[in-house]
A protein has these predicted regions:
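Intrinsic disorder
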Residues: 2-16, 32-33
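An exposed acidic His-Trp-rich patch
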Residues: 124-174
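Compact, well-ordered interaction domains used in eukaryotic information-processing assemblies
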Residues: 97-129, 133-136
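Generic structural signal for well-ordered, non-transmembrane alpha-helical segments
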Residues: 105, 109, 151, 176-183
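Mixed-charge, glycine-accented linear interaction segment located at domain edges/termini
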Residues: 159-214
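N-terminal low-complexity, intrinsically disordered segments
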Residues: 40-106
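Compositionally biased, intrinsically disordered low-complexity segments enriched in Pro/Arg/Gln/His
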Residues: 14-17, 23-25
Length: 214
């Protein structure tokens, strides 16, 4: 993302607007401004997850968009383009995009769906059988890859260097943070776009993936 695009990250319940520079699609240092959550128990290591996004000025929403009446397809594929990242802030590593055209609401929506897909085994965190899911990007052949074993989820991407290990979080943490990210993102977008808060698709989305207790 070229310097000057607006990136949004959260810390606690506060939201910040910061200027960031993203030139390459890489696994890189995680940002210092972040919303965090942590659990302990995987080899006694604390894993701290931050999910964030930026909106790109290169791919603005179509003029005269009626956000109140926008359909699911428009909300997921045509609006709110930018970039996203998932970061392990303790290890200072993240999986991020840098295209500028990723529909960030669609990413948040799909991430919540994927977390549920990874929880189909009735044995839950006792299951040693791996469970897989992919997040596809519509304008690219690249994918973000998710693999769950027991209660832990490895996250990698096609564009990561082959020698780089995935970032890893507990499934419980990923579920909670994905939903927090979705609700924080919706709050940001409804602040920026008149009528979006009255869109029935947004109501349904919030009801489908409510926030979870810490």
């Amino acid at each position: 993302m070229p310097y000057g695009d607006v990136a949004t990250s959260s810390y606690g319940k506060r939201r910040h607007l910061v200027l960031r520079q993203r030139r390459y699609l890489v696994l890189r240092q995680a940002p210092s401004l972040c919303r965090t959550g942590s659990v302990t128990g995987h080899d006694t290591i604390d894993y701290v997850l931050d999910i964030g996004y930026s909106l790109s000025r290169r791919f603005p929403d179509p003029p005269q968009t009626d956000y109140r009446r926008a359909g699911v397809r428009d909300l997921r594929h045509d609006l709110f383009c930018g970039d996203v990242y998932l970061a392990d802030t303790k290890a200072d590593r993240e999986v991020s995009t840098a295209w500028g055209w990723v529909p960030v609401l669609d990413f948040a929506w799909a991430l919540c769906d994927i977390v549920e897909q990874l929880d189909q085994d009735p044995r839950g965190s006792r299951s040693a059988k791996p469970q897989f899911a992919e997040l596809d990007f519509t304008e690219s052949t690249d994918r973000m890859l998710f693999e769950r074993r027991f209660g832990w989820v490895d996250i990698a991407a096609d564009w990561m260097p082959v020698e780089e290990p995935p970032i890893t979080f507990s499934h419980r943490l990923l579920r909670r943070e994905a939903r927090d990210f979705l609700h924080d993102l919706i709050a940001d977008l409804t602040d920026m776009h008149d009528g979006l808060a009255d869109n029935p698709a947004i109501w349904d989305l919030q009801a489908r993936f409510p926030r979870l207790p810490s």
